[in-house]
């Protein structure tokens, strides 16, 4: 099975268009003010307009404020929601959209128990985590600690063209999620780095 690729933290329409042209399966928009990759609704609409049919648009939230998700869902017609904070299962399912729950790795929590707590999630994104911090850290973690049999298994955290082929070979995930690993600076995607990343994912699939 081919590993899907999500390019997350897109802040410019031209970066979304380049990612799609090069073969990305999904584009991620960050709705978290603390992130250097955060976008407002005006910016998000321009990015979504650059994404053609059959490429997913994912909205990433970290402990969203009341009404924040509804505004994004209604205004952007997001395909999937991604929750990266301490959101309860009831909140995640409330919006009646497919959702992916981030699983914090390295913070002491049991990932199997974490997955079991979200039985209606469409997928789980395993990312590095430090106690007391919110969201991902852009760092790798021990992939041997990922439990087996996880639906929609997505690996994130410290991925780049230099290591993603090995991660794909070792984990055989449904998808990989990359942000800083394809950037020239925070929030600015680099076309050449995206192309190399996608090529390395394909190489990992073939070996």
UniProtKB/Swiss-Prot annotation:
What's any GO biological process attached to this entry? L-tryptophan biosynthetic process
Which reaction is catalysed here?
Answer: N-(5-phospho-beta-D-ribosyl)anthranilate = 1-(2-carboxyphenylamino)-1-deoxy-D-ribulose 5-phosphate
Sorted UniProt keywords:
Amino-acid biosynthesis, Aromatic amino acid biosynthesis, Isomerase, Tryptophan biosynthesis
Which pathway features in its UniProt record? Amino-acid biosynthesis; L-tryptophan biosynthesis; L-tryptophan from chorismate: step 3/5
Report the domain of life of the source organism: Bacteria
This one is known as N-(5'-phosphoribosyl)anthranilate isomerase
Q: Which family does it belong to?
A: Belongs to the TrpF family.
Native species of this protein? Answer: Halorhodospira halophila (strain DSM 244 / SL1)
List the Gene Ontology MF annotations in alphabetical order: phosphoribosylanthranilate isomerase activity
Q: Which InterPro entries match?
A: Aldolase_TIM, PRAI_dom, RibuloseP-bd_barrel, TrpF_fam
Q: Write the Enzyme Commission number(s) for this entry.
A: 5.3.1.24
Enzyme class comes to: isomerase
Pfam families referenced in this protein's UniProt entry, alphabetically: PRAI
């Amino acid at each position: 099975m081919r590993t899907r690729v999500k390019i997350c933290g897109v802040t410019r329409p031209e970066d979304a268009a380049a990612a799609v042209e090069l073969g990305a399966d999904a584009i991620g928009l960050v709705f978290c003010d603390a992130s250097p990759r955060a976008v407002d609704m005006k910016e998000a609409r321009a990015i979504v307009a650059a994404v053609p049919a059959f490429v997913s648009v994912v909205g990433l939230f970290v402990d969203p404020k009341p009404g924040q998700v509804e505004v994004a869902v209604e205004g952007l017609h997001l395909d999937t929601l991604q929750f990266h904070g301490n959101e309860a299962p009831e909140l995640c399912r409330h919006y009646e959209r497919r959702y992916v729950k981030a699983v914090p790795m390295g913070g002491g929590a049991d990932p199997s128990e974490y997955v079991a707590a979200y039985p209606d999630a469409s997928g789980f994104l395993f990312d590095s985590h430090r106690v007391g911090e919110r969201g991902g850290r852009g760092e790798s973690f021990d992939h041997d600690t990922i439990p087996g049999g996880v639906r929609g298994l997505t690996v994130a955290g410290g991925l780049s063209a230099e290591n993603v082929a090995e991660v794909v070979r070792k984990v055989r995930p449904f998808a990989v999620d990359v942000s800083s690993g394809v950037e020239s600076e925070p929030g600015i995607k680099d076309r050449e780095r995206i192309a190399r990343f996608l090529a390395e994912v394909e190489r990992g699939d073939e070996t």
